[in-house]
Every structure is written in structure tokens, then in C-alpha cells.
């Protein structure tokens, strides 16, 4: 039997220049290997638990049942698959220094790795387009934004990611003891462009456009708001206190309007609008009753002036109520867009070092020497992104915080 065949079948040995087998040395010391295993295990657990909480929260919380949140469910599913089907094998390959599971699983492992990374950024690209259409075509697009349409968009995202990921990797032959990405220049550059740089550029351009539209809309709302606040000053309102009629300026209500404005500004992005509609209807009814009771009984000019003032006062109030509802919807869209912008920015920050060094290696192989340790560090920073999204939702979204607390408290009471 040929000696090279024997050494090829022994995974813990390597062949030296004389053709004799030598023990394969691990790439890290024992302490470093233990530390790597502990850190990566924590990343896996945080990724699985956090993204499972996201999925459960979207399906169980009324405030999070908006159709567009299905994108977040699919994105969380991709991160869970990364933590279960990719990271454990990457950890074994990193600690042992060689690939133990054969060439067949290597091909699927690499395909799944590229698939989930590509699907994450394509998801974010689809989310940015969804945000753009909801901002620029608010009425028409929101009527079309049904769960069925969102599910179709998610299916298209996964199909595009699979078409990009699987064919090149499954057609490539792999060594039994090495599981590496295709090292040809054309594949490296094309995969980096299609899987990261092109979708990332689309996201940046779309969000720049969203920012411009939001800025223009904010200035328009500011002008309309100032005009609305000046209108009530043209009339005065009559109130009856302790049997006496008084004339009171609408400026006395400014503090109440400021309080309502503060409440409105504090509403979170996906908060259910049912309670707000009830609150606004109760407020409108109470104001009508107050307007009816505020004027004294008919008494010549005073009663005519008082009724006329009440009519003039109710018109701006109705206008203000409709503006409050539209502003509430705009606030939700604005805060939802901000949270997703943070998610996209963190994704780009986590994966840009890897894709930059990977493409740089393809362009200048000889003149640009990139240490393996640095390349591996960037690779693992990209994996860490799978555990970050639930943390972002928790920090920036009150509804997710409430849903997570409810899920955890429910679980603790059962145990």
C-alpha cells in the first residue's frame, strides 16, 4: 500500500518532505482552544435564545403582528440556522486545525454558510425597499402590504440567496482534510460583489433617499403645525365657572396640547393604535360635552358670541385630532425605519472587514499579505452579527422589550 494513502487516511497526521507521517499540531494552545470554545458557545446560545425570542414575540404580541415584521422572523430564522448548522462546524475546524467531516459535508457546509450570510443581507435589502415604499407611497403601498405579499417577498429573498450560493460551491471539489472557499480570483470578487457590496450599496442609497423624504416631510409637518397653532388665536372661548361667564384665551390649553404631544412622541414604533383611537374618541366626546356645557343659557349677544366661539374652536380641534392620527403613523414609520437602519449599520460593520480583506486578497495576492489570524478574526466578527439583532431590538424597541419580559415571566411562572 502506498504510504501517501495511509497518511491521507490519518487525520491526526501530516506528511513531511521525506514522505513519513508526522503528528498534526493544533493551531492553538490548550488554554486558547478552551477560551475559543467557551466564547463561541456563548455566542451560539445567545444567538439561538435571542432569535427564538424574536420569533415568539412577533407571533404572540399584538403590537408586533404587523405584516412587515415577518421580515424580522425570517431574518431571525437565518441567524438561528447559522448558529446551529454553520458555527459549530466552523468552531471544530478552528480548534482542530483540519476538516474532519469529509468533502461532501464540506460542500454543503460552505454552501449553507454563504447562503445564510447572503440571505441576511438580501433580507435587509428587501426591508429597506419595504421602508422606502411605505414612506414614499404610504397609502397605496400600505393597502398592498398584506402578509401574503410579504411572504412572497421573503420566498423570493431565499430563492435569490440560494441561486447565488449553491451552484458555485457544489460544483467545486474539496480536499478531505481542508474545507476552504474557492480561491480563484473570479469567484472571490463575484461572490463579494453579489453577496455583500451590491446589496449594501442598494441599502445605503435607499436609506439616503428615505432620509431625504423624511426630512422634507418633517419640514412640511412643521409648517402645517405652526399654521394650525396660530388659527385658534383668532377667536376666544367662553367658559362658565361657578355660574359666571369668563373669556379665556386658547393659550390656556397649550400646556395640555404639549402634554399630548409628549405622549405622542413617546409612542413606540409598532404600538397598537386601537387604544389610541379609543383614547382620542373619548377625548373628542369629552370636549364636545365641555363645549356644550361651557356656554351659558341663551342670553342675547353673549349666547350668540359664545356659540360662535365654540364653533370656531371645534374646527381646529377636529383638524388637530386628524393631524395627531397621521403624526402617530408617521412616528411609527420613523422609529421603525431608525431601528432597521441600526440593524443594517451593525450588519455592515460586522461583515465589511471580512469581505474587504477577502476581496483584497483576490486583487493583490503577492503584494498584500493578510495574516491568517486577522482574517479569522474578521470571519468570526461576522458570525457575531447573528447574535446582535435581538439585542438591538431590546435596546431600541419598547414593544420587543415588553414582549420579551412577558415571555420570560410566563416561562418563569410555569417553572
Swiss-Prot record:
Topology term for the membrane: Multi-pass membrane protein
Side of membrane Extracellular, spans: 1-33, 97-106, 174-184, 364-376
Protein's cellular compartments: Cell membrane
Membrane-crossing residue ranges in chain numbering: 34-58, 71-96, 107-129, 151-173, 185-208, 340-363, 377-397
An example Gene Ontology biological process: platelet activation
Annotated Gene Ontology cellular component terms: plasma membrane
Keywords: Cell membrane, Disulfide bond, G-protein coupled receptor, Glycoprotein, Membrane, Receptor, Transducer, Transmembrane, Transmembrane helix
Top-rank taxon, per record: Eukaryota
Chief location: membrane
Stretches with biased composition (Basic residues): 276-286
Residues with site note (Implicated in catechol agonist binding and receptor activation): 191, 195
Cytoplasmic side, ranges: 59-70, 130-150, 209-339, 398-415
Chain positions covered by the region annotation Disordered: 234-299
Glycosylation sites noted in the Swiss-Prot or TrEMBL record: 12, 18, 183
Residue pairs linked by disulfide bridges in the UniProt entry: 106-179
Implicated in ligand binding (site feature) positions: 113
Pfam families the UniProt entry points to: 7tm_1
Protein family per UniProt: Belongs to the G-protein coupled receptor 1 family. Adrenergic receptor subfamily. ADRA2D sub-subfamily.
Free-text function comment from the UniProt entry: Alpha-2 adrenergic receptors mediate the catecholamine-induced inhibition of adenylate cyclase through the action of G proteins. The order of potency for this receptor is dexmedetomidine > norepinephrine = epinephrine > oxymetazoline.
Name this polypeptide is given: Alpha-2Db adrenergic receptor
Amino acid at each position: 500500500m502506498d504510504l501517501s494513502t495511509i497518511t491521507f487516511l490519518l487525520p491526526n497526521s501530516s506528511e513531511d518532505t521525506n514522505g513519513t507521517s508526522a503528528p498534526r499540531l493544533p493551531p492553538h494552545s490548550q488554554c486558547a482552544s478552551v477560551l475559543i470554545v467557551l466564547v463561541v458557545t456563548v455566542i451560539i446560545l445567545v444567538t439561538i435564545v435571542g432569535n427564538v425570542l424574536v420569533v415568539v414575540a412577533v407571533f404572540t404580541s399584538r403590537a408586533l403582528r404587523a405584516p412587515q415584521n415577518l421580515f424580522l422572523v425570517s431574518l431571525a430564522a437565518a441567524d438561528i440556522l447559522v448558529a446551529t448548522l454553520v458555527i459549530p462546524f466552523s468552531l471544530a475546524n478552528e480548534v482542530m486545525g483540519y476538516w474532519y467531516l469529509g468533502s461532501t459535508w464540506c460542500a454543503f457546509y460552505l454552501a449553507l454558510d454563504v447562503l445564510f450570510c447572503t440571505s441576511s443581507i438580501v433580507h435587509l435589502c428587501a426591508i429597506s425597499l419595504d421602508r422606502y415604499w411605505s414612506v414614499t407611497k404610504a397609502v397605496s403601498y400600505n393597502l398592498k402590504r398584506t402578509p401574503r405579499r410579504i411572504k412572497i417577498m421573503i420566498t423570493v429573498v431565499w430563492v435569490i440567496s440560494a441561486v447565488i450560493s449553491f451552484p458555485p460551491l457544489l460544483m467545486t471539489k474539496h480536499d478531505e482534510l481542508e474545507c476552504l472557499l474557492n480561491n480563484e480570483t473570479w469567484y472571490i470578487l463575484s461572490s463579494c460583489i453579489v453577496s455583500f457590496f451590491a446589496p449594501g450599496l442598494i441599502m445605503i442609497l435607499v436609506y439616503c433617499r428615505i432620509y431625504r423624504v423624511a426630512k422634507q416631510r418633517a419640514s412640511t409637518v412643521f409648517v402645517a403645525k405652526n399654521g394650525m397653532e396660530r388659527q385658534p388665536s383668532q377667536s376666544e372661548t367662553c367658559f362658565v365657572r361657578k355660574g359666571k361667564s369668563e373669556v379665556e384665551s386658547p393659550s390656556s390649553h397649550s400646556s395640555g396640547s404639549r402634554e399630548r404631544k409628549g405622549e405622542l412622541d413617546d409612542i413606540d414604533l409598532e404600538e397598537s393604535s386601537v387604544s389610541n383611537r379609543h383614547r382620542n374618541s373619548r377625548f373628542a366626546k369629552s370636549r364636545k360635552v365641555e363645549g356644550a356645557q361651557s356656554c351659558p343659557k341663551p342670553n342675547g349677544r353673549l349666547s350668540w358670541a359664545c356659540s360662535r366661539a365654540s364653533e370656531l374652536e371645534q374646527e381646529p380641534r377636529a383638524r388637530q385630532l386628524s393631524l395627531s392620527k397621521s403624526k402617530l403613523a408617521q412616528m411609527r414609520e420613523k422609529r421603525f425605519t431608525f431601528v432597521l437602519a441600526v440593524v443594517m449599520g451593525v450588519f455592515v460593520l460586522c461583515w465589511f472587514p471580512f469581505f474587504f480583506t477577502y476581496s483584497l486578497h483576490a486583487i493583490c495576492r503577492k503584494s498584500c499579505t493578510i495574516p491568517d489570524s486577522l482574517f479569522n478574526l474578521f470571519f468570526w466578527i461576522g458570525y457575531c452579527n447573528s447574535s446582535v439583532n435581538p439585542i438591538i431590538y431590546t435596546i431600541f424597541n419598547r414593544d420587543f422589550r415588553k414582549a420579551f419580559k412577558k415571555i420570560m415571566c410566563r416561562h418563569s411562572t410555569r417553572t
